[in-house]
Every structure is written in structure tokens, then in C-alpha cells.
Amino acid sequence: LEREELELWLKNHNNYELFKGYVKINFLIDLDMDMFDVDDSKKQLLELIDKEKKEYRLRKYVNVFKYAAVVIIFLGIGYLYQLGCFTKTPEVIIPSDSITLKLENGNVEVLSEDGTSQILDANGSVVGSQKGKQLVYDNDNVMEKLVYNTLTVPYGKRFEVKLSDGTKVYLNAGTSLKYPVKFIGGNKRQVFLTGEAFFDVAHDVTHPFIVNMENLNVEVLGTEFNVSAYSEDLTTDVVLIKGSVNLYTNGKTLNEGLRIEPGIKGALNRKLGSITSEAVDTSIYTSWMEGDLVFRNMSFENIVKKLERYYNMKIIIVNKQLNNEIFNATFKDEPPIQDVLNSFGKSYGISHTIKDNAIFIN
């Protein structure tokens, strides 16, 4: 009887339009409206009524909307299946040699070295842009809280980022930098570094700039300096080019730290927790920015670490006696690794073999 009442009720044009509008209004997936078939929905509805057996009878308008609601549910579930909402989304595997940018919402974007793109915040607003090997963040965005991005550069590559305050940071291979999308007035300008980077800090007397590392912090007002803080190294080195910086370890205050001047390298011994300083040729520590490899009084073990990062290749020292041997060498203009290895072979009699994408030093 319910079926007969519904069919009779739907024959009226106004009732039919009312039924159709009810389903569409309550069907929350607007994108599906182009595929919505009212006649098919009516057929499903009538079939459902035929299967249902009731001992009591409700008012006809209540039944109409009750069944319409059931159709809505069926349509919604079917649409969600079409979208894949009930299937497991395949995990996207990012190649290990990719330059990546982790956004505030946890999403990770892959940056092409010759690409151009916009950087968006969680609200879809543009906060910066990429042009080739450089990210540039805007300073005219309105933000009430600190929001961070993390730029990660793999072995074998280098990249640059210009922060919202105008500070320029050059990231060496195997480096990660976490920084605010925009620095907010009243707060210190803080970034977090692992690896190696050169900082050209925009001067701001009222907002000190702090580079936080695992065991060491560097605080400046505006200056140029290089920081090397690779986890596999025994020391964290800060080489000052211009201005002045203060170094202090975690748990210490700024006044308990060490102040260094241009031409000085401050080094934290991670095992001892002590900071020492010495005069150095600063060009040795910034040569990587030009693609050069410069080794001065460096152990072969540390040279190999730099070569692995520079070329993104696994290098195994078979002859362990070489580890502590000291070498001096200079290689200009992004030299091929074969040239570097041949030079060591010619000058020092060190041979090598290549097998399974690894270099063995004999």
C-alpha cells in the first residue's frame, strides 16, 4: 500500500519536484549532482518498499521522506566508494635524493632544482615561492603565531632559502633547516639546523637571530657565518666571516658562552662539552658554496665523509690505516669524483675500486 501511495503521490508534478529537491538538498556530496539520476533513485526506492513489511501504516508524507533519506544514504556510500574513501591510500615513497619541503600540516613537497612553484599555508594563502635552487618567503603576510617549514637537502645537492626577514641561508648537502614561515615581532628569530649552512643574517637589533643545533646555539644580531653540525662529526664548528656571534651550549646562558670575532672558528667538542676557538682561513670553510672541495690538515676519514655528502656515494675505507692520515688538497668547480680519486691515487698512491655503486679505498 505504501508503494501505491508513493507512486500516486509522485505522479503529481509538484510532488515529484519536491521529492527530487529533498534528495538533492540532503545529499551532501555536491560533486555527485551531475551524475544524480532521480528516476533511478525512484526505482531503488520502490524496490525497497516492496521488500519491507510493516504491520502499521504511517502518514504518506513521512514515508516519502523516510525512504528518500534511505536513498540518500545509499547514494552517499556509493559515492564515497567511488572516491576510494574505503580503500587504503597507497603510501607515496619519496626518492632519497629529493630536495623536500615539509609544510606546517605535515605534507611533504618535492622541490625540483629547476622548478618554479608557490608555497602555500594551511589556509591556501601564498607565503613564498620557489625559483630554481632558491626559496623566497614573503614578509607581508599577517600571522599571529609561529608556523614552521622544514627544508631538507640530500647528499649530492645544495639549496638556498631567503627567510621572511631577509636572512639568506645556503644549505650544503645532507642538511635540514627548520624555520618560521614568518618571524613575529616580540620574539627572537630562531631556526633549527642539522648539517652545514652559511648564514647571511639580516640586521635587527631588537630581534636576535639564533641558530639552534643539537648541543650548541649561535646568537647574533646581524652577521655572516658558517655552521657545520653534522651528526657524524665529533665537533660542531662555527666560522665567523663578518660581525660577531655568541656561542653557548644547551643548558647555559648567553653570558656563559663564548664570543668570537671575524676570522675565528669556535668549535664545540661534543664528547667533552667544551668550546674552543682558533684563528682560521675562513675561505676554506665557505668554499663549498662555490662547489669547491678544500681539505686542510684533514684526516682521510673526515675527507671521505665530505666526499660521501658531496657526491652522494658510499665510500668504504678497506685499509683502516688510512683513517688517521692527514692530507691537504684542493679541487675546484664541482670536480667529478673520478678526478678526485685519480688525484689521490697519483699524489699518494691510494687505489680504489668501484663495485655495486660503492667505492672501495684499498
What are these regions (language model features)?
Residues 5-8, 18, 44, 55-56, ...:
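Short, solvent-exposed alpha-helical surface patches in well-structured domains
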Residues 28-64:
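Positively biased amphipathic helices and basic secretion/translocation or surface-docking motifs
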Residues 1-24:
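N-terminal amphipathic alpha-helical interaction or autoinhibitory segments
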